[in-house]
């Protein structure tokens, strides 16, 4: 069994503290969220001081999480899954500390039509966060592994700020296009 947390990061703190108390430890929890302090979430001090967003989520819910599906656009997830072995198959990275839980999520990624890539432990989940070379680029497995390796941890805040600026530009562009209609 798998539970997916798919809410804004700021809302995780508002979940009932006992939400997962009666959920068996064998149930895998996937965090698919991304922290956007300027666009949506406001500032979360622990994350701004260096805690990774998925580590913060795990702390808030009192349960380990696997980071996955945060580095693909919904449209790609919906439309671009293909059979194993298909040339050009998009890869998705999965990061987490439990090898069993991670294996379950890697299998889910494959079942959904994407090449699963082990992104390391949760401490390495920053490599697939907004703005990094691996974020939302619809890469195949080998290029995704290279992109994960190329990420520079000292640039996390810069990566995030660049991505948020791009989102703002995209929103403004869509707004301008709708005004022309």
Annotate each PLM feature.
Residues 87-181:
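Active-site-lining helix/loop region of Rossmann-like oxidoreductase modules
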Residues 15-19, 41-42, 79-80, 106-107:
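Short amphipathic alpha-helical segments
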Residues 25-28, 32-83, 101:
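Rossmann-fold NAD(P)-binding glycine/threonine-rich loop
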Residues 21, 59, 107-110:
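Solvent-exposed polar/charged
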Residues 1-30, 34-40:
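Rossmann-like NAD(P)-binding element
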Residues 8-11, 72, 98-99:
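Short beta->alpha connector loops
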Residues 2, 64, 115:
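Residue-level detector of anion-binding/catalytic polar loops
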